[in-house]
Amino acid sequence: MSSNVIKVRKAEGKIKQLIQVGANSFFADEPEPVGNGQGPNPHDLLDSALGACTAMTVMMVAQRKQWPLQDVRVEITHQEDDATYKLVRKIELVGTLTEEQRAYLMGIANKCPIHKALHKKLEVESALVG
């Protein structure tokens, strides 16, 4: 599966970066004193990818099944040491769902593309250009 080319360039500020994803753009930064606190930091971006993907995947399945899911609220935190980066995900399903529907949607949460990607062997290939 191919993806958008993500472009990252320095923006105005200490270390603030402009991130362009297709036609969309946003900033990443670090809090003071390292940065200016004008955007999420890279860890927050990684963590939020899982949260957004979880909510979108669960909502899409519930809509397809015409279940009364009004909202999916996801809270992500992480814990890190030298050997492990642990994401803790709490999911709230808002709506008058049966226990069976809730259990099914919790299983779907683990099938979101980012959750699956984070459980694969990850490789990062870097090349110096220019």
For every predicted segment, state its role.
Residues 1-48, 56-130:
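Extended beta-strand/beta-hairpin segments
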